[in-house]
């Protein structure tokens, strides 16, 4: 039987027949059709720490002495209204943006630090 004939036979099978075929192949060859699942261990934790994060939370740690400039910058980067931006700055430390890309996070951090705020990327 050629590969094309096998593929054609599989195309003509019902879902139930395909399920039975998979189970028969698992039994015959001693394999599993389940997707491999990584088990986290001590080595995996160390390897995970070496991987670079792709999403960051931008946290306003402290507004500094130039609070008005910081409020303006917060409004600019978040799109919030004056009242909301002021409340956010007054309530520091507060998260400005969640799951930001590294470049977005760095840009927001630079803009706020430029006006005297202390910002952290977590």
From Swiss-Prot:
GO cellular component: cytosolic large ribosomal subunit
Subunit structure, as described in the record: Homodimer. Part of the ribosomal stalk of the 50S ribosomal subunit. Forms a multimeric L10(L12)X complex, where L10 forms an elongated spine to which 2 to 4 L12 dimers bind in a sequential fashion. Binds GTP-bound translation factors.
GO MF annotation terms: mRNA binding; structural constituent of ribosome
Database matches in PANTHER family: 39S RIBOSOMAL PROTEIN L12, LARGE RIBOSOMAL SUBUNIT PROTEIN BL12M
Alphabetical GO biological process terms: translation
Family: Belongs to the bacterial ribosomal protein bL12 family.
Record's signal peptide: none
Protein name according to UniProt: Large ribosomal subunit protein bL12
UniProt keyword annotations, A-Z: Ribonucleoprotein, Ribosomal protein
Function: Forms part of the ribosomal stalk which helps the ribosome interact with GTP-bound translation factors. Is thus essential for accurate translation.
Species for this entry: Clostridium botulinum (strain Loch Maree / Type A3)
